[in-house]
Every structure is written in C-alpha cells, then in structure tokens.
Amino acid sequence: METSFVQTTMALGLSSKKASSRNVAVERKNLITVCRFSVKTLLEKYTAEPIDDSSEEFVNFAAILEQILSHRFKACAPAGPVSWFSSDGQRGFWDYIRLACSKVPNNCVSSIENMENISTARAKGRAWIRVALMEKRMSEYITTALRDTRTTRRFYDSGAIMLRDEATILTGMLIGLSAIDFSFCLKGEVLDGKTPVVIDYTPYLKFTQSYDYLTDEEERHSAESSTSEDNSPEHPYLPLVTDEDSWYSKWHKMEQKFRIVYAQKGYLEELVRLRESQLKDLEAENRRLQLQLEEAAAQNQREKRELEGVILELQEQLTGLIPSDHAPLAQGSKELTTPLVNQWPSLGTLNGAEGASNSKLYRRHSFMSTEPLSAEASLSSDSQRLGEGTRDEEPWGPIGKDPTPSMLGLCGSLASIPSCKSLASFKSNECLVSDSPEGSPALSPS
C-alpha cells in the first residue's frame, strides 16, 4: 500500500515538473515571438522622425523587453505562483545589468546610478532601456551580459530566456533597432517604478476566417440567393478587396521595407565612416609612436657612445694615478744623472787644510738602497778619466790618475760590472780619509 502511494506521489511530481517545464518553454516562445512582432512594428513605423515615449509601439516594446529581462529572475521572486505575463514579482533585473554590463566600454551604468530623480531598481532598469536605445547599443549590452555566464546563472533560474538559446535570437533582433533614432525624457511617471508593465497583444492578433466549412450545397444556395432582388447580402467568402487594392498594399509594404533597408544602410555607412576615421587616427598614432621609438633608440646609442668614451678616459686617468713597481728606480735614476765623483769633496781641498797630519772624518752620503743604484745609476768613465801619472808635490785632485785603490770604485760607470766594484760593499755610512803625505788616503769601512 505504501509502495503504491510513493509511486503515485513520484508520478505526480514528475508530471508536475514536466508541466512546469512545458509552461516555461511556452513562456519563452511567446515572449520571443511577441518581441519579434514588436521590433518589426517599430521598424515599419519609423520614418525620419525619432520615436519617443508617446509612441504606442515603443511603450509595448519596452514592456516586452522588461518582461524578457525579468523572466525567471531570482532576486525578488514572490512566494506564490506568478503568470508569465505578470510583472508583480519580476523586479530587480537592473542589479544584473549593472554587474554584467560594467565591462562594456563607455557604458551608461554609472550615469544611471548617479541620477537623482531615479531611486528604485525598476526605474533604473527602465531608464537603462531608454538610454541604451538612444545610444543604439542595446544589442551590444545584451551580448556582453550573456558572455558573463557566471553572473547570469547567479541571477536567473533554470529555464530563463537569458540562459537559453532564445537569448541569442533576442540579440539578433535588437540589432535592427540601431537604424532607428530614439528620443526620450528620463523623467515622469513612466520611470517611477510604480506603474505596472502591461503588454498589449491586440496589434499582433490576426483573425483569419476559414471557409472550409461551407459545403457545395451551401455555396450554391448562397449563389442562388444572391441573384434574388429581395435577399442580396454580401457573402463572407467573396473577396473584400480588389486586385488594385492588393497591388497597392503590396507596393506599400515594399516601400516600407525599402525605407527600413535604406535607413539601416545609412546607419551602416555612418558606422563604417566612423571606423575608418578611428583607423586613420590609430595609424597616425602608430606612426608617431614609431618615430618616437626610433628617436629614443638613436638617443640611446649616442648616450652609449658618450658613456663608453667617458669610461675610456676615466680608465686612462686611473692608469696614470696608480703607482708602478719601477717608480723608485726612476726616481733614483733622476737623482743620479750627475756623476757620483762630483758628490765627493776634492782632494785638493783636503791638502789645503790647516794641517797635513790632521785627519778628518767625512761622512759619505747615505743611500736608501744600493741595489737600485747599482742597476740604474751610471757614471761616465770617459769624462772622468784621471791622468797617467802624478807628482808628489801636487795635491790630489780630479786631474790625473788616482793611485788610491779604494777610490777605483768611483771611477767609470756603475753599470759596467767588470770595471768597478759593486756598490754592495759600500753599505757602511762612514769612512776615514787620511791626508798624510806618506801614503795615499785610504777608505776603510768603520
């Protein structure tokens, strides 16, 4: 018993779900069909004059579009069931538009948010519909919103038009509205959000009478009765319009279609001219940026060469400031450019002193290092040659041969190793010189 009851309940639930999904599908189809009729009516009505709020066709179209955007909206859904043509609970689609259309470049969302006379979400949604139509960007807004599938699923329940393929059909229909000029005043009772949205279906209802139910006898009876003088009613199956009227109506429809296509052609041409001007501006900007890039590259090359020259100059200056290992040798060679013999006192001066027996202590010049002197200093032996012989009565002097063996190191060149002693033997700082006439003065290291 319980099993059968559960099965019955499940069957009823499945049937109710199927009925609900079928009703939702019917709602989608009806709304899209009515929207197609409304757009077609607007295109047929449009002439050179812009369409405003006084147009019944626009009022009906705005109501239909608001119903489509509010179809199965989650935000303010009431607790009880709501019919698909009702607007009591279908509110708040502006919250979805505000988030989903914020990525549209140069959008009107912020300007609508800052309007002082519009406070409710419904009023802002209606204002957005009018502004988007005046901007001729309604299809662009809807397309951008549909791309944000995450936000769309967040605001709409399953089965909504914005989540089905009918949304793509809607964007295709809204493209044709770009050829129409709209002019609206964003003030008044229409935008206060309190007036309910009502769709008028009478312009889209078409009554077509069928004559299939008439039998042959009835047709003959009607034909016979039409010949009588007393009874001459107009038969319902007879054509009410002549061929001329039918041709005129066809011509009128073709003219309207031509005007619509011509208006769309003008809009597309204007759009192409706008895109061409934008392309030219972008090309000019690209050329200007390319020139700036080339100038910057040339300037960078010049600065690089200048910096390389500065680096080389600084390296030369740094090389001149760093002391080399042979600097003491060069300084020593400069000090010893004069012969070393001239640095010693003359022997004649010693002979002319107060007494011959008095010995004097002479200090030799001290050198910081004898090894550099032995390597770099040179004495000209040819210019300081002494004479071959000397007399006992003549004082010792630079002229003549010096018989003193200890003074041989001062003759000749220090650079010639075979002809002189090494200066390494002169490491002592003092030597005694005796000017006694008995013998040659001797130098002995102390």
Swiss-Prot record:
A Gene Ontology biological process annotation? positive regulation of cGMP-mediated signaling
From which domain of life does this come? Eukaryota
Family to which this protein belongs:
Belongs to the RUNDC3 family.
- Which residues are annotated as modified residue Phosphothreonine in the UniProt record? T215
Q: Which PROSITE patterns match?
A: RUN
Coiled-coil-forming residues are: 267-322
Q: Where is this region: Interaction with RAP2A?
A: 1-298
Q: What is this protein called?
A: RUN domain-containing protein 3A
Residues the record lists as Phosphoserine modifications: S232, S416, S419
Please describe what this protein does.
May act as an effector of RAP2A in neuronal cells.
The species this protein belongs to is Pongo abelii (Sumatran orangutan)
PANTHER family recorded: RUN DOMAIN-CONTAINING 3 PROTEIN RUNDC3, RUN DOMAIN-CONTAINING PROTEIN 3A
Keywords for this protein: Coiled coil, Phosphoprotein
